UniProtKB/Swiss-Prot annotation:
Protein name: 2-C-methyl-D-erythritol 2,4-cyclodiphosphate synthase
Organism: Bacillus subtilis (strain 168)
PROSITE patterns to which the protein is assigned, alphabetical: ISPF
Gene giving rise to this polypeptide: ispF
InterPro entries in alphabetical order: MECDP_synthase, MECDP_synthase_CS, MECDP_synthase_sf
A GO BP annotation: isopentenyl diphosphate biosynthetic process, methylerythritol 4-phosphate pathway
Domain of life: Bacteria
Root EC class: lyase
Cofactor note: Binds 1 divalent metal cation per subunit.
Highest classification ranks of the organism: Bacteria, Bacillati, Bacillota, Bacilli, Bacillales
Chain positions recorded as 4-CDP-2-C-methyl-D-erythritol 2-phosphate binding sites: 9-11, 35-36, 57-59, 62-66, 101-107, 133-136, 140, 143
Subunit structure, as described in the record: Homotrimer.
Family label: Belongs to the IspF family.
Length: 158
């Protein structure tokens, strides 16, 4: 049996925080605002995985009202989510992710992001795709006020 999940997330860019995307810290003058480390890409991946097994979203599992998750490492959250998927007997088919950001440029970090996501999903890097695009300076991402990400995952019974 195959199942598909889709994830989407957005975080505001602010001064005074590190920029962590796909489990990789990216040198930039701003970082993403959030209760956890605000890793927009890993949140998206986790949401896609939870959706594929009908387990809601990361807000249900890691509420931003719970102090336990303050500044949480999103990679650890993803590993927990993947544990739920595995417990239900699924393995990764593949995942395709898109980062939507005007700045900074993501290309130098894409391969490291792919490797980190593959590690979190206990998969081969060939099963993980990450790409980035801009909105041609339109909207909040185009004005570099925030970063968005989306992902689609295919899982199958192992």
């Amino acid at each position: 049996m195959f199942r598909i999940g889709q994830g989407f997330d957005v975080h505001q860019l602010v001064e005074g925080r590190p920029l962590i995307i796909g489990g990789i810290e990216i040198p930039y003058e701003k970082g993403l605002l959030g209760h956890s480390d605000a890793d927009v890409l890993l949140h998206t991946v986790a949401d896609a995985c939870l959706g594929a097994v009908g387990e809601g979203d990361i807000g249900k599992h890691f509420p931003d009202t719970d102090p336990e998750f303050k500044d949480a490492d999103s990679f650890k959250l993803l590993q927990h989510v993947w544990g739920i998927v595995k417990q239900k007997g699924y393995v990764l088919g593949n995942i395709d992710c898109t980062i939507i950001a005007q700045k900074p440029k993501m290309l130098p970090y894409i391969e490291d992001m792919r490797k980190r996501i593959a590690e979190g999903l206990e998969a081969d890097v060939s099963q993980v795709n990450v790409k980035a695009t801009t909105t041609e300076k339109l909207g909040f991402t185009g004005r570099a006020e925030g970063i968005a990400a989306q992902a689609t995952v295919l899982i199958q019974k192992g």
